[in-house]
Amino acid sequence: MSKRYTLLKKDGKARRGQFVTPHGTIQTPVFMNVGTLAAIKGAVSSMDLKEIGCQVELSNTYHLHLRPSDKVVAKMGGLHKFMNWDRPILTDSGGFQVFSLSAMRKIKEEGVYFNSHIDGKKIFMGPEESMQIQSNLASTIAMAFDECIPNPSTREYVERSVARTTRWLERCKIEMDRLNSKDDTINKEQMLFGINQGGVYEDIRIAHAKEITKMDLDGYAIGGLAVGESHEDMYRIIDAVVPHLPEDKPIYLMGVGTPENILEAVDRGVDFFDCVLPARNGRHGNVYTSEGKLNLMNAKFELDEKPIDETCQCPACKHYTRSYIRHLFKAKEMLAMRLCVLHNLYFYNKLMEEIRTAIDGGYYKEFKEKKLQEWKVK
């Protein structure tokens, strides 16, 4: 396997790197903008994403499999052509949705039987099916099919689940290699990331990290966090796992998180992030600023002539006032959501740019502390 990830600079444990993909080079640390159904909720287009500095878009295997179906996407030339996005795309494996959305599910060695959350139809998904769907989607990076273990879970259950996730990963790798060698595969250079699981048990996490590292995959994710555990537990697990993952591969913390979480995780050696929070919060008028979070629904913004954030260069802040955007929300105008989602994603993407600059300059710790102070609720 050719070397894709280059560690350019370390500042403490914080890593500044670049990851070469068939769809462009990713500068890390990076925040992936979540477009579950191949679009960001809030009427944000792929052209908008480029304007606000998005490097990587993340789409959801489970949802796209159900609608419009991965076969439709494949017939349309893969996700990149389908959504008109020529930069990297990561698809998750569908595992998290199978376990979180489906009340009716049976986990077997071969995979998971579950009911569609749309129409109740019985569906089966295992490692091979997840790889086949992601190959049809033709994403840049495919995630391995795993069980996202609920928190809390007993030690015995976690041990059994992690062992099965390892066996599933082996099957994912074999199937991915097979698919990438086929003549009719859209993206023959599709990459595979493995996922570390183990709940809040450090020793299980470490043993699993060592096991999956032997498979020499393109990257490694820490999964099963941000599912109800405390921030202290999350940081403890990251501290335990990162030293046992390869230094020459990217490390991805799945589903995390708040700007504060990102600063802390970067300080612990994490490279990739994704979270629905910026878009979801934006759709409800909750916006991130250089001075912390604001709720634009608040009556105090009714006559506020300032932009959302006076230091921000996003499309919303360059052209509109807090008063106007608040009015749009009260009038239930779709533009309100669009402007706030654009602002929040720009805020996250800009934060990652500043993080990379701080690591490059060797002042990441000072940068982190300064940001955390600025964001304290005033």
Spans of features found by a protein language model:
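C-terminal extensions of enzymes
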Residues: 1-18, 26-35, 40-43, 146-152, ...
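Glycine-rich phosphate/ribose-binding loops and adjacent secondary-structure elements
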Residues: 166, 175, 179, 187-308
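Glycine- and acidic
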Residues: 151-155, 159, 219-225, 334-337
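Conserved, mostly hydrophobic/aromatic
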Residues: 24, 57, 92, 134, ...
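Non-catalytic, usually N-terminal nucleic-acid engagement modules in DNA/RNA processing proteins
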Residues: 1-185, 299-302
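Surface-exposed helix-capping loop/turn segments at secondary-structure junctions
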Residues: 175-185, 249, 355-367
